[in-house]
Amino acid sequence: MIAHLDGPHPDLSPDSADPGQIWALLDKLASSPAPPPYTTAVAGTPSGAARLHGWAELLTAPPGDLDPGIRDRLHELAELEATWPGLAHGDRIVHGDLRADNMVRDHHRGVTFVDWAHATTGPACIDAASLAPQLILAGHTPQKIARLLDEHPATATDPRATTAFLAALTGHWHRNARKPAPSGAPGLRAYQHRVATAGTALLTLRMNN
C-alpha cells in the first residue's frame, strides 16, 4: 500500500511522547495473528531475522577490540544465538527493520511504520526487541529498556525467544561492524559499533537477571 504521510520522523528520546505511541502500535500489531491479506502478501518471503548471527564467527577469532566482559562470554553468547532459528517462527506481523527513519509521525495518524521491505511473519518479540537498542542510542538507559522488555506483552510472553533474538541481533551487529566499510556509506560501521554496544548492554542485563 502507498499512502502520503505528512510529518517528521519520531523522536525516540526519553523526554518525547513518541516512544509511548510506538509501543502502543507494537502492542496492537502483536496482540493477534497477522490477517490473511498480510500473510498472503508475505508468503514465501524468507525471514531475515531468522538468519541473524555473529557470535559463533567471532568466537573462532575474537577481535582485539572486543570488550573483555563479552570476550569471556563468547561461548555462552554463541550457544544462546544458536537457539534463535528454532524460535524464530510465529504468526505475528513483523516489520523487520524498525528505526526512527522507518517511521513517520503523521500530523493526522500519529506514528506510522513505513518502508516494509523486510515484512514477514514471526514471533511477537522481533520488532519490539530490535527497537530496544535504538531507544538506548536515543538516550534511554539500558536498565529502563530492560524493564520495559520485561513488562511489554510482545517481549514478556516468551522471554526465552526475546533473549535469543537479542543475542542473534547483537552478534550480527558486532560481526558486521568489523567488516571493511562499504563505498558510499562512510558512517555505517561506526553506527553498527554503537548499536552493537547498546544491544550488548541490554543483553548482558537479561543474561545476568
Residue ranges with predicted function:
Residues E79-I126:
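Active-site acidic catalytic loop and adjacent metal/ATP-binding pocket
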Residues M1-T39:
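ATP-binding pocket architecture of kinase catalytic cores
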Residues L29-P37, W84, G139, A177-A181:
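A general structural signal marking secondary-structure boundaries and capping sites
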